[in-house]
Curated annotation (Swiss-Prot):
Protein name (record): Small ribosomal subunit protein uS4c
InterPro entries referenced in this protein's UniProt entry, alphabetically: Ribosomal_uS4, Ribosomal_uS4_bac-type, Ribosomal_uS4_CS, Ribosomal_uS4_N, S4_RNA-bd, S4_RNA-bd_sf
HAMAP family for the chain: Ribosomal_uS4_B
Stated family: Belongs to the universal ribosomal protein uS4 family.
């Protein structure tokens, strides 16, 4: 299954707000339903609940079905909580790190910067959005002038307290902002509100 490239509002109306996909906020269809409509709604099956959690995770991080399944398989082979390790793997992707640093408004826009070879990790160009960042990595945003003003305005409008503790943003060189990965992200710093156990349960027979 390919990566979704359709209307983003359509997705967040169905799956609720996904900060990585779009910074627009809408009221979900579930919340828009009237009291009489809610009373006649059918009971949602456990499968549908797990499916929705999986879809929220997939669309928020901009993954294909195969990519997410591969991450689940990797998480299963690692020591520790499969759900938490899965979230760590997704959060430590380069495209998501740029998003969490506040350099770009969404993960798709971070992916564009990476694909255009404007991002360096430890002084080496990285053009793979799924690149796995590690503690002590230094990420440099070497965007051309056409992007610099946009990135600067974005950073200025982004509250510093929104940057999670495992990351640090340095503006000592305004034209080349740098991000530092301090340590692996913990569960409390995950930006997406989700029950990761539902995703693990969804893939229990596939991974």
């Amino acid at each position: 299954m390919s990566r979704y490239r359709g209307p983003r509002l359509k997705i967040i109306r169905r799956l609720r707000n996904l900060p990585g996909l779009t910074n627009k906020l809408v009221e979900s269809k579930k919340n828009q339903a009237s009291g009489s409509d809610q009373s006649i709604q059918k009971k949602v099956s456990q499968y549908c609940i797990r499916l929705e959690a999986k879809q929220r995770l997939r669309f928020n991080y901009g993954l294909t079905e195969r990519q997410l399944l591969n991450y689940v398989r990797i998480a299963r082979c690692a020591k520790g909580s499969t759900g938490q390790i899965l979230l760590q793997l997704l959060e430590m992707r380069l495209d998501n790190i740029l998003f969490r640093l506040g350099v770009v408004p969404t993960i798709p826009s971070a992916r564009q910067l990476i694909n255009h070879r404007h991002i360096l990790v430890n002084d080496r160009i990285v053009d793979v959005p799924s690149f796995h960042c590690k503690p002590k990595d230094i990420i440099t945003i070497g965007a051309p002038k056409i992007y610099q003003s946009i990135i600067t305005k974005r950073i200025e409008s982004f509250a510093k307290d929104q940057i999670p503790d495992h990351l640090t943003l340095s503006l000592s060189e305004p034209k080349k902002p740098k991000g530092f990965v301090n340590y692996l992200i913990n569960r409390e710093s995950i930006g997406l509100k989700i029950n990761e156990l539902l995703v693990v349960e969804y893939y229990s027979r596939k991974a």
